[in-house]
């Protein structure tokens, strides 16, 4: 019998009582002295680079995570069969063992491919000029520009309006505190919140605030898992986040490992970018007044290679897309806001 989604986790990082305190000197707005501006066209390059980079990595990440997920299910099925002594189950037991063997082999193959991919990243094979030309030759640039612009404006407006609440959620360290806060502010359960938190992680790593980056990464992955669970169950994410927190406390073996691996992979990508030759923080002399557009400030405060950074962001997002699997025996039994 298949196990219910989602995998429990991520397990909260050790924190003091209540939630972690925000650092008072962390101003992420474009007007802040900590948020230098990218040269003209830099922000557009992020927008264009995201689609191309994500498409190139999507199949690899999906296969890798799906393999881990299926292996966990096969191991759990084998464990349940071991509880019975009936000879009629011998055939099922043999099938389960065979499946586990095949899945382990596939997992090792994808692990080797992942290591090779990381090596290519370290060698800086993401040539900015080549990527730029490739991006503008892709057919997706011919899609409806008006809708893209409207969606982007809507996203910026949301993050500008709710920046402080998103940051407050990012600082929470307890499952109950996170669930209670989202219950009070259900509109924060959305893609914009996940994107803001992910960009914040890169900003914190740029400031060498590793411990705080890990805390925000924890909450970013939580939000993305909620979003993927809602997509696979075809429900409003605001109606299923309570179920996520309920299952997150179960700590079932196998699913916990899948989630933990994805969280660690995301944090590794953030650190990898900060150690790359492309990581060259810039400073500016003149600053505009505070505008409060948090996500834009985060983006513009980072180094000037948008292709590599956006690839890292989207690899993190795409890697979570295949961790979630719809379950037939648990169809959309979601609570409502």
Curated annotation (Swiss-Prot):
Region Interaction with Hsp70, annotated ranges: 267-337
Highest taxon above the source species: Eukaryota
Keyword Magnesium set for record: no
GO molecular function: heat shock protein binding; protein-folding chaperone binding; unfolded protein binding
Cellular component annotations (GO), alphabetically ordered: cytoplasm; cytosol
GO BP annotation list: protein folding; protein stabilization
Composition skew (Pro residues), residue ranges: 1-11
Start and end residues of each stretch annotated as Self-association: 2-171
Coiled coil: 84-122
Subcellular location: Cytoplasm
Chief place of localization: cytoplasm
The family this protein is said to belong to: Belongs to the CDC37 family.
Known partners and oligomeric status: Self-associates. Forms complexes with Hsp70 and Hsp90. Interacts with CDC37, FKBP4, PPID and STIP1.
Function according to Swiss-Prot or TrEMBL: Co-chaperone that binds to numerous proteins and promotes their interaction with Hsp70 and Hsp90.
Protein name: Hsp90 co-chaperone Cdc37-like 1
Organism: Bos taurus (Bovine)
């Amino acid at each position: 019998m298949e196990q219910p989604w989602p995998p429990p986790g991520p397990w909260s990082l050790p924190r003091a009582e209540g939630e972690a305190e925000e650092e008072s000197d962390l101003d992420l707005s474009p007007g802040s002295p900590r948020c230098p501006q990218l040269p003209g066209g830099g922000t557009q390059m992020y927008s264009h680079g995201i689609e191309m980079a994500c498409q190139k990595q999507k199949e690899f990440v999906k296969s890798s995570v799906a393999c881990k997920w299926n292996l966990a299910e096969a191991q759990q099925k084998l464990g349940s069969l071991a509880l019975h002594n009936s000879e009629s189950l011998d055939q099922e037991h043999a099938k389960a063992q065979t499946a586990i063997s095949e899945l382990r082999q596939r997992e090792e193959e994808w692990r080797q491919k992942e290591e090779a991919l990381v090596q290519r990243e370290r060698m800086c094979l993401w040539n900015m000029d080549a990527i730029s030309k490739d991006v503008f030759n892709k057919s997706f640039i011919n899609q409806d520009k008006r809708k893209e612009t409207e969606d982007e404006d809507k996203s910026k407006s949301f993050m500008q309006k709710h920046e402080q609440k998103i940051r407050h959620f990012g600082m929470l360290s307890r499952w109950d505190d996170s669930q209670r806060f989202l219950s009070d502010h259900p509109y924060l359960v959305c893609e914009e919140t996940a994107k803001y938190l992910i960009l914040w992680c890169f900003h914190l790593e740029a400031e060498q605030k590793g411990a705080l980056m890990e805390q925000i990464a924890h909450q970013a992955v939580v939000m993305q898992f909620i979003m993927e669970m809602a997509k696979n169950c075809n429900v409003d994410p605001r109606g299923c986040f309570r179920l996520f927190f309920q299952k997150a406390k179960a700590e079932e073996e196998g699913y916990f490992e899948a989630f933990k691996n994805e969280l660690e992979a995301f944090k590794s990508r953030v650190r990898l970018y900060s150690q790359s030759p492309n990581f060259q923080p810039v400073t500016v002399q003149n600053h505009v007044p505070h505008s409060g557009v948090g996500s834009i400030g985060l983006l513009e405060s980072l180094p000037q290679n948008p292709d590599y950074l956006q690839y890292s962001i989207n690899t993190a997002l795409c890697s979570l897309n295949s961790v979630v699997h719809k379950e037939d025996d648990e169809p959309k039994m979601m609570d409502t806001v």
